Protein backbone atom coordinates (compact mmCIF):
# COMPACT_ATOMS: atom_id res chain seq x y z
CA UNK A 1 0.00 0.00 0.00
CA UNK A 2 1.19 3.47 -0.80
CA UNK A 3 2.20 5.89 1.89
CA UNK A 4 1.67 9.62 2.06
CA UNK A 5 3.96 10.38 -0.89
CA UNK A 6 1.62 8.66 -3.32
CA UNK A 7 1.89 10.88 -6.38
CA UNK A 8 3.90 13.92 -7.34
CA UNK A 9 4.08 16.36 -10.21
CA UNK A 10 7.56 17.52 -11.14
CA UNK A 11 8.87 20.95 -10.27
CA UNK A 12 12.28 22.59 -10.47
CA UNK A 13 14.74 21.64 -7.72
CA UNK A 14 18.36 22.69 -8.07
CA UNK A 15 19.44 20.02 -5.60
CA UNK A 16 18.30 17.36 -8.06
CA UNK A 17 21.14 18.30 -10.41
CA UNK A 18 23.67 16.60 -8.15
CA UNK A 19 25.17 13.32 -9.37
CA UNK A 20 25.73 11.30 -6.21
CA UNK A 21 27.12 8.22 -7.94
CA UNK A 22 30.67 9.56 -8.23
CA UNK A 23 31.34 10.21 -4.53
CA UNK A 24 33.86 7.66 -3.22
CA UNK A 25 33.49 7.07 0.52
CA UNK A 26 35.13 4.11 2.27
CA UNK A 27 33.15 2.00 4.73
CA UNK A 28 33.51 3.28 8.29
CA UNK A 29 33.22 -0.02 10.12
CA UNK A 30 36.74 -1.38 10.75
CA UNK A 31 35.74 -5.04 10.75
CA UNK A 32 33.82 -4.51 7.53
CA UNK A 33 36.87 -2.93 5.86
CA UNK A 34 38.98 -5.93 6.85
CA UNK A 35 36.44 -8.35 5.46
CA UNK A 36 36.02 -6.33 2.28
CA UNK A 37 39.72 -6.78 1.56
CA UNK A 38 39.28 -10.56 1.51
CA UNK A 39 36.61 -10.68 -1.19
CA UNK A 40 35.71 -9.81 -4.73
CA UNK A 41 32.13 -8.63 -5.16
CA UNK A 42 29.86 -9.42 -8.10
CA UNK A 43 26.60 -7.88 -9.27
CA UNK A 44 24.26 -8.53 -12.18
CA UNK A 45 22.59 -6.73 -15.06
CA UNK A 46 19.89 -7.84 -17.48
CA UNK A 47 19.46 -5.77 -20.65
CA UNK A 48 17.22 -6.01 -23.70
CA UNK A 49 18.90 -6.55 -27.05
CA UNK A 50 16.09 -4.46 -28.54
CA UNK A 51 15.84 -0.70 -28.08
CA UNK A 52 12.64 1.32 -27.82
CA UNK A 53 11.50 4.83 -28.62
CA UNK A 54 8.52 5.42 -26.32
CA UNK A 55 6.39 2.69 -24.78
CA UNK A 56 5.12 1.18 -21.57
CA UNK A 57 7.38 -1.06 -19.53
CA UNK A 58 6.06 -3.23 -16.71
CA UNK A 59 7.76 -5.72 -14.39
CA UNK A 60 6.51 -7.74 -11.44
CA UNK A 61 9.46 -7.82 -9.08
CA UNK A 62 10.63 -8.37 -5.57
CA UNK A 63 13.29 -5.70 -5.41
CA UNK A 64 16.37 -6.26 -3.28
CA UNK A 65 17.15 -4.23 -0.21
CA UNK A 66 20.29 -3.91 1.92
CA UNK A 67 22.37 -0.91 2.97
CA UNK A 68 24.90 -0.14 0.25
CA UNK A 69 22.88 -1.93 -2.45
CA UNK A 70 20.99 -0.57 -5.46
CA UNK A 71 18.23 -2.64 -7.08
CA UNK A 72 16.80 -1.18 -10.28
CA UNK A 73 14.70 -1.13 -13.43
CA UNK A 74 15.61 1.49 -16.01
CA UNK A 75 15.59 2.64 -19.62
CA UNK A 76 18.97 3.66 -21.01
CA UNK A 77 20.41 5.03 -24.25
CA UNK A 78 23.29 2.65 -24.86
CA UNK A 79 25.83 5.29 -25.95
CA UNK A 80 25.21 7.62 -23.02
CA UNK A 81 28.46 6.66 -21.30
CA UNK A 82 30.70 7.66 -24.21
CA UNK A 83 30.87 11.39 -23.47
CA UNK A 84 32.52 13.74 -25.98
CA UNK A 85 29.22 15.51 -26.56
CA UNK A 86 27.04 12.37 -26.73
CA UNK A 87 23.68 12.90 -25.03
CA UNK A 88 22.64 10.99 -21.91
CA UNK A 89 19.09 9.56 -21.84
CA UNK A 90 17.87 7.46 -18.89
CA UNK A 91 14.65 6.83 -16.93
CA UNK A 92 15.03 5.09 -13.55
CA UNK A 93 13.27 3.14 -10.85
CA UNK A 94 15.73 2.38 -8.05
CA UNK A 95 15.50 0.90 -4.58
CA UNK A 96 18.45 2.34 -2.68
CA UNK A 97 19.99 1.04 0.51
CA UNK A 98 19.05 3.96 2.73
CA UNK A 99 15.36 3.89 1.74
CA UNK A 100 13.89 0.42 2.41
CA UNK A 101 10.29 1.71 2.51
CA UNK A 102 10.18 3.18 -0.97
CA UNK A 103 11.90 3.71 -4.27
CA UNK A 104 13.54 6.52 -6.20
CA UNK A 105 12.35 7.72 -9.61
CA UNK A 106 14.64 9.74 -11.84
CA UNK A 107 15.22 11.10 -15.33
CA UNK A 108 18.81 11.68 -16.41
CA UNK A 109 19.54 13.88 -19.42
CA UNK A 110 22.31 16.25 -20.45
CA UNK A 111 25.70 14.68 -21.13
CA UNK A 112 28.26 12.59 -19.29
CA UNK A 113 30.20 15.75 -18.52
CA UNK A 114 27.14 17.58 -17.13
CA UNK A 115 24.11 15.49 -16.25
CA UNK A 116 20.67 16.88 -15.46
CA UNK A 117 18.71 14.79 -12.95
CA UNK A 118 15.37 14.92 -11.12
CA UNK A 119 15.42 12.37 -8.30
CA UNK A 120 12.35 11.86 -6.13
CA UNK A 121 11.80 9.38 -3.29
CA UNK A 122 8.38 7.70 -3.00
CA UNK A 123 7.41 6.07 0.30
CA UNK A 124 5.35 2.93 0.76
CA UNK A 125 4.04 1.37 3.97
CA UNK A 126 6.37 -1.63 4.15
CA UNK A 127 9.84 -2.58 2.89
CA UNK A 128 9.72 -3.13 -0.87
CA UNK A 129 11.80 -6.29 -0.56
CA UNK A 130 9.09 -8.00 1.50
CA UNK A 131 6.75 -8.64 -1.43
CA UNK A 132 6.40 -8.64 -5.19
CA UNK A 133 5.13 -5.36 -6.66
CA UNK A 134 4.33 -4.29 -10.21
CA UNK A 135 6.56 -1.42 -11.35
CA UNK A 136 5.66 0.46 -14.53
CA UNK A 137 7.13 3.28 -16.59
CA UNK A 138 5.22 5.05 -19.37
CA UNK A 139 7.38 7.06 -21.77
CA UNK A 140 5.79 9.22 -24.47
CA UNK A 141 6.78 12.44 -26.27
CA UNK A 142 4.50 14.33 -23.86
CA UNK A 143 5.26 12.78 -20.47
CA UNK A 144 7.06 10.19 -18.38
CA UNK A 145 5.03 8.51 -15.62
CA UNK A 146 5.88 5.99 -12.91
CA UNK A 147 3.40 3.52 -11.38
CA UNK A 148 3.43 1.09 -8.47
CA UNK A 149 0.84 -1.71 -8.48
CA UNK A 150 -1.21 0.20 -11.06
CA UNK A 151 -1.31 3.50 -9.19
CA UNK A 152 0.42 6.54 -10.65
CA UNK A 153 3.19 7.74 -8.35
CA UNK A 154 4.81 10.51 -10.37
CA UNK A 155 4.37 12.27 -13.70
CA UNK A 156 6.72 14.59 -15.53
CA UNK A 157 4.87 16.51 -18.26
CA UNK A 158 6.71 18.12 -21.14
CA UNK A 159 4.33 21.09 -20.92
CA UNK A 160 5.58 22.15 -17.47
CA UNK A 161 8.99 20.48 -17.30
CA UNK A 162 11.27 23.39 -16.40
CA UNK A 163 14.39 21.31 -16.97
CA UNK A 164 13.14 20.21 -20.43
CA UNK A 165 14.02 16.61 -19.63
CA UNK A 166 11.03 14.95 -21.31
CA UNK A 167 11.78 16.79 -24.55
CA UNK A 168 15.44 15.75 -24.24
CA UNK A 169 14.56 12.03 -24.26
CA UNK A 170 15.10 11.63 -28.00
CA UNK A 171 17.24 8.49 -28.24
CA UNK A 172 16.10 4.85 -28.44
CA UNK A 173 16.66 3.12 -25.10
CA UNK A 174 17.20 -0.43 -23.93
CA UNK A 175 15.29 -1.86 -20.97
CA UNK A 176 17.57 -2.85 -18.09
CA UNK A 177 17.54 -4.29 -14.59
CA UNK A 178 20.51 -4.49 -12.26
CA UNK A 179 21.79 -5.02 -8.75
CA UNK A 180 25.06 -3.44 -7.64
CA UNK A 181 26.83 -1.54 -4.86
CA UNK A 182 27.70 2.15 -5.07
CA UNK A 183 30.91 3.71 -3.78
CA UNK A 184 28.78 6.52 -2.32
CA UNK A 185 27.79 5.59 1.21
CA UNK A 186 26.16 9.02 1.50
CA UNK A 187 23.70 7.96 -1.19
CA UNK A 188 23.02 4.30 -0.39
CA UNK A 189 24.69 3.46 2.94
CA UNK A 190 27.46 0.99 3.71
CA UNK A 191 27.35 -2.51 2.25
CA UNK A 192 27.94 -4.99 5.08
CA UNK A 193 29.21 -8.36 3.96
CA UNK A 194 26.95 -10.24 6.41
CA UNK A 195 23.98 -9.24 4.19
CA UNK A 196 25.39 -10.94 1.09
CA UNK A 197 24.13 -12.73 -1.01
CA UNK A 198 21.33 -10.33 -2.01
CA UNK A 199 18.81 -11.16 -4.74
CA UNK A 200 16.40 -9.19 -6.93
CA UNK A 201 13.61 -11.40 -8.32
CA UNK A 202 11.62 -10.79 -11.52
CA UNK A 203 8.41 -12.75 -12.13
CA UNK A 204 7.60 -11.26 -15.54
CA UNK A 205 8.39 -8.33 -17.83
CA UNK A 206 5.85 -6.84 -20.24
CA UNK A 207 6.54 -4.31 -23.00
CA UNK A 208 4.00 -2.17 -24.89
CA UNK A 209 4.42 -0.12 -28.07
CA UNK A 210 3.19 3.48 -28.10
CA UNK A 211 1.21 4.90 -31.04
CA UNK A 212 2.03 8.60 -31.34
CA UNK A 213 -1.05 9.25 -33.51
CA UNK A 214 -3.66 7.68 -31.22
CA UNK A 215 -1.82 8.10 -27.90
CA UNK A 216 -2.44 4.44 -27.00
CA UNK A 217 -0.31 1.52 -25.83
CA UNK A 218 -0.44 -1.95 -27.42
CA UNK A 219 1.14 -5.01 -25.84
CA UNK A 220 4.23 -6.09 -27.78
CA UNK A 221 5.53 -9.02 -25.76
CA UNK A 222 5.65 -10.63 -22.32
CA UNK A 223 8.48 -12.71 -20.88
CA UNK A 224 7.46 -15.01 -18.00
CA UNK A 225 10.94 -16.56 -17.76
CA UNK A 226 10.16 -20.19 -18.38
CA UNK A 227 13.75 -20.08 -19.64
CA UNK A 228 16.38 -17.48 -20.49
CA UNK A 229 15.82 -16.04 -23.98
CA UNK A 230 19.26 -15.01 -25.24
CA UNK A 231 17.71 -13.53 -28.39
CA UNK A 232 15.75 -11.08 -26.26
CA UNK A 233 18.19 -10.48 -23.38
CA UNK A 234 21.86 -9.97 -22.67
CA UNK A 235 23.79 -10.29 -19.42
CA UNK A 236 26.09 -7.52 -18.20
CA UNK A 237 29.85 -8.08 -18.00
CA UNK A 238 31.37 -4.84 -16.72
CA UNK A 239 32.30 -2.93 -13.58
CA UNK A 240 29.76 -0.85 -11.64
CA UNK A 241 31.71 1.01 -8.96
CA UNK A 242 32.18 -1.54 -6.13
CA UNK A 243 31.21 -4.67 -8.08
CA UNK A 244 31.87 -6.54 -11.30
CA UNK A 245 28.58 -7.33 -13.00
CA UNK A 246 28.99 -10.79 -14.49
CA UNK A 247 26.76 -13.05 -16.61
CA UNK A 248 26.64 -15.98 -14.16
CA UNK A 249 24.86 -13.77 -11.60
CA UNK A 250 21.79 -13.60 -13.89
CA UNK A 251 19.89 -16.89 -13.58
CA UNK A 252 16.41 -18.30 -14.19
CA UNK A 253 15.11 -20.60 -11.46
CA UNK A 254 11.56 -22.00 -11.27
CA UNK A 255 10.09 -19.34 -13.55
CA UNK A 256 11.79 -16.43 -11.76
CA UNK A 257 14.69 -14.44 -13.17
CA UNK A 258 17.15 -13.62 -10.39
CA UNK A 259 19.81 -10.94 -10.26
CA UNK A 260 22.35 -11.74 -7.56
CA UNK A 261 24.86 -9.69 -5.59
CA UNK A 262 27.51 -12.11 -4.33
CA UNK A 263 31.04 -12.28 -2.94
CA UNK A 264 33.93 -14.70 -3.42
CA UNK A 265 37.25 -15.08 -1.67
CA UNK A 266 40.13 -13.54 -3.59
Placement of each model-derived feature along the sequence:
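C-terminal motif of bacterial Sec signal peptides marking the signal peptidase cleavage site
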Residues: 3-6
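GH16 jelly-roll
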Residues: 9, 15-266
Amino acid sequence: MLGSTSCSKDDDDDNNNQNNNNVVVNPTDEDDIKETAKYNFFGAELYSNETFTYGKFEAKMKMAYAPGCISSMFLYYNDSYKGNGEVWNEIDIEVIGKEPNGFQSNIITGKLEKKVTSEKIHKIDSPVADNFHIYTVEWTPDYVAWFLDGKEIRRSDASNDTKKQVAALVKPQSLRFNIWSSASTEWVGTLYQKNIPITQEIDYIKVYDYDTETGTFTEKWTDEFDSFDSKRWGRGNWTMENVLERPKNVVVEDGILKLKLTKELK
